[in-house]
């Protein structure tokens, strides 16, 4: 198949899911929601679990919505961008935010644990950045889990003995399956509200501007959508 920036696409019906009266805008966000749903299922986040989310990008923010819907408490989310942390706070007012600074992973972890007032049972790592993964390892409790959703370098260093002596599970996600029907139900029922994540919208004819906006951190874009009125 060539590109999907087109008004009409032929696709096998067997691989399509009906979204009913859901907006196409929300429908387009079912894919990142599927990423988060797979992570929720495989990481085992439960009601009352203290959770750390590393990274307040689109996946981290949707993971935040899922953790709140699942009853995780407290939830701490981290990022290097204060604007994204402010956005996370607007999305889920009860979330605790940590601005990542140029300090060691251990120092970051100490600040995060102090903010949460408890060691997280699970860390959902949504950046793939080596220092962020290491921070998550230093944060979680004995027997906790660091679940890496983000994609990082081919090779990176980890605090191996921290993982070993604290019996921390390090788990990864690269693909997902069978999530679409669940994602559709959650959005249609209002359990998960994705509407605030689209911060910029462009017509199909302005697709180049859309990509430029998405690539420029100064725009504060979370999700940029290209739409067609036809």
Outline where the language-model segments fall.
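Glycine-rich cofactor phosphate-binding loops and adjacent beta1-alpha1 units
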Residues: 43, 68-70, 85-169, 208, ...
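C-terminal hydrophobic helical "lid"/dimerization subdomain
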Residues: 111, 134-138, 177, 181-230
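Glycine-rich phosphate/adenylate-binding loop and adjacent beta-alpha elements
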Residues: 1-16
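Rossmann-fold dehydrogenase core element
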Residues: 145-147, 158-197
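Mid-domain Rossmann-like dinucleotide-binding core that forms the NAD(H)/NADP(H) cofactor-binding site
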Residues: 21-103
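Structural detector of well-ordered beta-strand residues that form the stable sheet scaffold
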Residues: 17, 52, 76, 145-147, ...
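Residues in the short beta-alpha loop(s) of Rossmann-like NAD(P)-binding domains
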Residues: 80-81, 152, 176
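Glycine- and other small-residue-rich loops at beta-strand/loop junctions that grip anionic moieties
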Residues: 8, 28, 56, 77, ...
């Amino acid at each position: 198949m060539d590109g999907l920036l087109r008004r009409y696409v032929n696709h096998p019906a067997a691989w399509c899911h009906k979204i009913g009266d859901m907006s196409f805008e929300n429908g387009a966000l079912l894919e990142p929601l599927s990423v988060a749903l797979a992570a929720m299922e495989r990481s085992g986040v439960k009601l009352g679990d203290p959770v750390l989310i590393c990274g307040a990008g689109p996946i981290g923010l949707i993971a935040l919505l899922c953790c709140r819907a699942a009853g995780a408490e407290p939830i701490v989310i981290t990022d290097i961008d204060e604007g994204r942390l402010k956005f996370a706070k607007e999305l889920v007012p009860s979330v605790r935010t940590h601005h990542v600074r140029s300090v060691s992973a251990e120092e970051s972890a100490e600040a995060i644990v102090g903010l949460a007032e408890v060691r997280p049972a699970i860390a959902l790592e949504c950046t793939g950045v080596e220092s962020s993964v290491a921070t998550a390892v230093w944060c979680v409790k004995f027997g906790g889990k660091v679940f890496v959703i983000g994609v990082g370098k081919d090779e990176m260093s980890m605090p191996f003995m921290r993982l070993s002596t604290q019996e921390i599970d390090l788990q990864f996600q690269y693909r997902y399956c069978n999530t679409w029907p669940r994602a559709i139900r959650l959005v249609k029922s209002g359990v998960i509200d994705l509407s605030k994540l689209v911060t910029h919208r462009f017509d199909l004819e302005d697709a180049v501007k859309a990509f430029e906006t998405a690539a420029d951190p100064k725009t504060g874009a979370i999700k940029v959508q290209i739409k067609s009125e036809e």
